[in-house]
């Protein structure tokens, strides 16, 4: 039996199994040991079953796959060769695990006889990602003693675990040489595949698992709790689950606190700012019940409120993950928000607390005055909705600007917002944005800090394949301006936290053949944006600001509002 032919047969069964589980995008890094998987991926692409994407940097490739999976809400498979190539996927695997994004990570490996004996590019890859995958599938070296049916069943068992929890399945696949001298005809006619012939021509899984019924029942005490004073807090949600929350909370007369990732239009905008007001915060803590939809709040003030609240606490979130960092004694509903709302009709009543609305209106005027008309981080955050395309998507990086956007921006209802807030790292943000663009096939606005951009420069190469207008805003405040929020000596802060780079991104754009603009005023920016939307390619828009402008304004707004006296 030819080793190279059987390697391909083994790989064929693996990828055919994943395709039947919803994989339509394969992200591939170049490498020799992964050749059997790569050649089967090419065969599937030629058959129209999948789309293959390539990238030379495995760390970026992992986040690119993450972005596609976020946008398509379908699992994505990654194929890499053996050695440290595999380790570069770790950050994306962590982010996927934290947020329940489904990835299949296929790591080619040296065969066991080459482990721990000084062989080249052979590292310990079994279970190498620790507890972050929902399942680790450590396959043996391809061997006809194992039936193809066994291989499918083993993989589908891991898929079942993924569907229950959401996250990453790591499949480690050792291959012995030779890797190259197999033809499609030899693979397709191999006797080992004969029991699968009917399965191979059908688009159905090997094991049929009936969908779990997730009917949401009204809480037995809902008629009691809906008469009480409540606060609705909305965190990160899929866009389709945002509809109806605002009107439901308004009908109840309850206070609504929203995160920028929620897709919900706030009734009392600028929550991150006005929650700094101690008088209003103390009154808000007198609520009888808090109902939280979604999780992972950006706002420090909302998090502080959740931590301080000691009353009845309900959490509605579909993943089943533990998402209460403040460890309330709570009632948990594993449900989609719109299903839960349908089962819990509102009781129409007047607002029980008027101060948030009054303070929100005051904030609107005060913030406009403080931000002014210059092109700055804060003004970009405040007026970001005017730059967004209809039927587009927004990606926010993890920098000072995401906090400013959360504090100042009011987006249209259900406007898709993507972030990497599972681990909130600054790695892979460009790659994720590129993946979201490819996966959604919609115009994309990505807003990313300069340090984050420097950390992921290789991923600019991924934007050459976008087919929709893509605007990459790089906020260049000369380093990590978010660290201005820390109570650290200025000299120490510059040397060990902010790390000024004193550079710009014009040459980077040229290197990756991207359109580039550096607007100085809002008039310049509006012209640049108009041109960018006329092109079905990526434009890098660099916004240069003074290092401390954004953080100083943010701190000033919070300080001023914290002492404001507003009559309801």
Curated annotation (Swiss-Prot):
UniProt keywords, alphabetically: Magnesium, Manganese, Menaquinone biosynthesis, Metal-binding, Thiamine pyrophosphate, Transferase
One annotated GO molecular function: manganese ion binding
Q: In which pathway does it act?
A: Quinol/quinone metabolism; 1,4-dihydroxy-2-naphthoate biosynthesis; 1,4-dihydroxy-2-naphthoate from chorismate: step 2/7; Quinol/quinone metabolism; menaquinone biosynthesis
Matching CDD domains: TPP_PYR_MenD, TPP_SHCHC_synthase
Q: Which Gene3D superfamilies match?
A: 3.40.50.970, TPP-binding domain (3.40.50.1220)
Q: What remark does the entry make about the cofactor? A: Binds 1 thiamine pyrophosphate per subunit.
Reaction catalyzed: isochorismate + 2-oxoglutarate + H(+) = 5-enolpyruvoyl-6-hydroxy-2-succinyl-cyclohex-3-ene-1-carboxylate + CO2
Tell me its cofactors: Mg(2+); Mn(2+); thiamine diphosphate
**What Pfam families does the record tag this protein with?**
TPP_enzyme_C, TPP_enzyme_M_2, TPP_enzyme_N
Gene Ontology biological-process entries: menaquinone biosynthetic process
Q: What is its EC number?
A: 2.2.1.9
User: What's this chain's function?
Assistant: Catalyzes the thiamine diphosphate-dependent decarboxylation of 2-oxoglutarate and the subsequent addition of the resulting succinic semialdehyde-thiamine pyrophosphate anion to isochorismate to yield 2-succinyl-5-enolpyruvyl-6-hydroxy-3-cyclohexene-1-carboxylate (SEPHCHC).
Question: What NCBIfam families would the database entry show?
Answer: menD (TIGR00173)
| Record's subunit section | Homodimer.
The similarity annotation says: Belongs to the TPP enzyme family. MenD subfamily.
By what name is this protein known?
A: 2-succinyl-5-enolpyruvyl-6-hydroxy-3-cyclohexene-1-carboxylate synthase
Organism of this sequence: Haemophilus influenzae (strain ATCC 51907 / DSM 11121 / KW20 / Rd)
For this protein's source organism, the top of the classification is:
Bacteria, Pseudomonadati, Pseudomonadota, Gammaproteobacteria, Pasteurellales
């Amino acid at each position: 039996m030819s080793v190279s032919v059987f390697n391909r047969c083994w790989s064929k069964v693996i990828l055919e199994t994943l395709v039947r589980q919803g994989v339509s995008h394969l992200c591939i890094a170049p490498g020799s040991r992964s050749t059997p998987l790569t050649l089967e991926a090419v065969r599937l692409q030629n058959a129209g079953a999948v789309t293959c994407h390539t990238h030379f940097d495995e760390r970026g490739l992992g986040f690119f796959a993450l972005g596609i999976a976020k946008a398509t809400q379908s699992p994505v498979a990654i194929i890499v060769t053996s050695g440290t190539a595999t380790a570069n996927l770790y950050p994306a695997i962590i982010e996927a695990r934290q947020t329940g994004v489904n990835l299949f990570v296929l790591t080619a490996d040296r065969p066991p006889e080459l482990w721990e004996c000084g062989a080249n590019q052979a590292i310990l890859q079994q279970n190498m990602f620790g507890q972050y995958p929902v399942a680790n599938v450590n396959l043996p070296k391809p061997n006809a003693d194992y039936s193809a049916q066994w291989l499918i069943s083993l993989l589908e068992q891991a898929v079942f675990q993924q569907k229950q929890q959401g996250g990453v399945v790591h499949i480690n696949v050792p291959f012995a040489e030779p890797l190259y001298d197999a033809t499609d005809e030899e693979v397709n006619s191999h006797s080992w595949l004969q029991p699968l012939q009917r399965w191979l021509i059908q688009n159905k899984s090997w094991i049929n698992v009936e969908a779990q019924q997730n009917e949401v029942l009204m809480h037995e005490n809902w008629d009691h709790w809906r008469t009480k004073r409540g606060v609705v807090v909305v965190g990160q949600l899929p866009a389709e689950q945002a509809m109806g929350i605002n009107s439901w909370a308004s009908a109840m007369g309850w206070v609504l606190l929203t995160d920028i990732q929620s897709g919900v239009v706030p009734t009392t905008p600028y929550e991150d700012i006005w929650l700094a007001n101690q008088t209003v915060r103390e009154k808000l803590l007198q609520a009888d019940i808090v109902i939280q939809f979604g999780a992972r709040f950006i706002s420090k003030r909302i998090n502080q409120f959740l931590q301080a609240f000691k009353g009845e606490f309900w959490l509605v979130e579909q993943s089943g993950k533990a998402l209460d960092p403040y460890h309330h004694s709570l009632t948990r509903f594993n449900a989609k928000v719109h299903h839960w709302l349908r089962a819990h009709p509102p009781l129409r009543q007047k607002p029980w607390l008027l101060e948030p609305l009054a303070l929100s209106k005051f904030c609107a005027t005060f913030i406009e005055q403080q931000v002014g008309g210059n092109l700055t981080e804060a003004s970009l955050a405040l007026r970001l909705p005017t730059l967004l395309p209809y039927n587009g998507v927004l990606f926010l990086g993890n920098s000072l600007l995401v906090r400013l956007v959360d504090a100042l921006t009011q987006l249209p209802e259900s406007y898709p917002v993507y972030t990497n807030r599972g681990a909130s790292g600054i790695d892979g943000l460009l790659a994720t944005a590129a993946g979201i663009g490819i996966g959604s096939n919609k115009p994309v606005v990505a807003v990313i800090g300069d340090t984050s951009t420097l950390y992921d420069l290789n991923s600019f190469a991924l934007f050459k394949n976008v087919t929709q207008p893509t605007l990459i805003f790089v906020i260049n405040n000369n380093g990590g301006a978010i660290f201005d929020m820390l109570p650290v000596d200025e000299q120490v802060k510059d040397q060990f936290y902010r790390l000024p780079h004193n550079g710009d991104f014009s040459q980077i754009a040229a290197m990756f053949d991207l359109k580039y603009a550096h607007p100085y005023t809002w008039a310049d920016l509006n012209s640049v944006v108009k041109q960018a939307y006329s092109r079905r390619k990526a434009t890098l828009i660099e916004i240069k600001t003074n290092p401390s402008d954004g953080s100083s304004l943010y701190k000033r707004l919070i300080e001023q509002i914290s002492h404001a006296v507003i009559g309801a």
